[in-house]
Amino acid sequence: MQEHAKILLLPHGKDLEIPRYASKGSSGLDLRAAIEGSMTLKPGMFELVPTGICIELPEGLEAQIRPRSGLAAKFGITVLNSPGTVDQDYRGEIKVCLVNLSKNEFTINRGDRIAQMVIAKVEQILLVEAEEIGETERASGSFGSTGTE
């Protein structure tokens, strides 16, 4: 059974296409820039870009805001806090924190697809304080500890 989520189009986003999957096999719904006219991201600059939407997700789900691969690969534009998390109980406007990692200015126009929103299941656990935790072969090996081969 397919889950349903409610979407609220804010006044500054009513004329934009609602998020949708670009193809039958897509994992992410495309989010669009709900800005007036255009904006320019200078190299190294980041900006919160409004999408003009609010969502109400069913319990047990979250929305992850992820970069669009084409923007990252071709222009160095990505989501700064990737993946951004939209909690199930958040009801405000979804905004995307875009950053320009390239050496060139990048212009975002109204209606441009700027990120993708992936809906995922969430599990919550109860943390119990302990005096010790179990041993593993890896132990406390951290970044790069398992090698590259």
Curated annotation (Swiss-Prot):
Coiled coil: none annotated. The keyword Calcium does not apply. GO terms for biological process: dUMP biosynthetic process; dUTP catabolic process. Its cofactor is Mg(2+). Gene3D superfamilies: 2.70.40.10. One of its GO terms (molecular function) is dUTP diphosphatase activity. Pathway: Pyrimidine metabolism; dUMP biosynthesis; dUMP from dCTP (dUTP route): step 2/2. Substrate binds at residues 68-70, 81, 85-87, 95. This is Deoxyuridine 5'-triphosphate nucleotidohydrolase. InterPro entries: dUTPase, dUTPase-like, dUTPase-like_sf, dUTPase_trimeric. It catalyses: dUTP + H2O = dUMP + diphosphate + H(+). Keywords: Hydrolase, Magnesium, Metal-binding, Nucleotide metabolism. This enzyme is involved in nucleotide metabolism: it produces dUMP, the immediate precursor of thymidine nucleotides and it decreases the intracellular concentration of dUTP so that uracil cannot be incorporated into DNA. Belongs to the dUTPase family. It comes from the Bacteria. Its EC number is 3.6.1.23. The gene is dut. Pfam families: dUTPase. Transmembrane segments: none annotated. It is an enzyme of class 3 (hydrolase).
